[in-house]
A protein has these predicted regions:
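Hydrophobic h-region of N-terminal signal peptides that target proteins for export
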Residues: 6-17
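Extracellular glycan-recognition regions
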Residues: 17-212
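Positively charged n-region of N-terminal signal peptides that target proteins for export
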Residues: 1-4
Length: 212
């Protein structure tokens, strides 16, 4: 029987395949280990309808890279506005009350509507700068288009330095989203798996590489 690997080094934290449930502090989410599309994965489902965080216990992150394979799709019975919201929260503080987040809207990636396609990626900073405030005050600055397929495994990477973050998807050489003014400033906090409302989410092969 294949085991779930857990590796923790001084400079790199990495989980091959599923992330052990013992390493997650799931909040408002149900967590299980499953096989999804041939890959051993951590499945997070939205228990209360509002999404939630699953911080990695003991993680501390300021600058560096976070890489993961993820797949998100609307859960069965989700409201029409569900998009399969899925991503990573970082510099999580206050037990999850404050954090930076970059996430995907997988169903937007191939929508027959350019406005939706251009909202395929999203930066938000809770609680002061949710996505809707950023869209209203700075339309187009904190979201972008990238090709996505709901429910399909997607390679996701964010690189963070100071108040700047870049999102890379599908191992692309260039970022599909650049944020130059992270709202929490040059902060330090935990890393968390992030799941939005009405989402069935899968995560595997998480790697956190701090930057000196």
């Amino acid at each position: 029987m294949r085991s779930i690997l857990y590796i923790l080094l001084p400079s790199i934290a990495a989980w091959a395949q599923a992330i052990p449930l013992a390493n997650l502090d799931a909040r408002k989410l149900d967590a299980t280990v499953v096989t999804y599309q041939g890959k051993e994965a951590t499945r997070l489902t939205d228990r209360e309808g509002g999404g939630g965080l699953a911080p990695i216990k003991g993680s501390s992150f300021k600058d560096g890279a976070i890489e993961v394979q993820l797949a998100g799709k609307p859960s069965e019975g989700a409201l029409a506005g569900a998009r399969g919201f899925i991503g990573i929260a970082f510099r999580v503080q206050g037990g999850g009350s404050k954090y930076e987040c970059i996430y995907l809207r997988p169903t937007n990636g191939r929508a027959d509507d350019m406005a939706r396609r251009n909202h395929s990626t999203q930066y938000a900073s809770e609680p002061e700068w949710p996505w809707d405030r950023l869209r209203k005050e700075s339309p187009g600055d904190y979201e972008s288009y990238v090709d996505l397929e709901a429910g399909a495994w997607t390679r996701y990477k964010i690189v963070v330095k100071g108040t700047r973050a870049e999102l890379y998807v599908h191992e692309a050489a260039q970022p599909c989203l650049i944020v130059k003014d992270l709202k929490l400033g040059d902060a330090t906090g935990a890393v968390a798996l992030w799941v939005g409302p009405g989402t069935d989410a899968y995560f595997a092969n998480l790697k956190i590489t701090p930057m000196p």
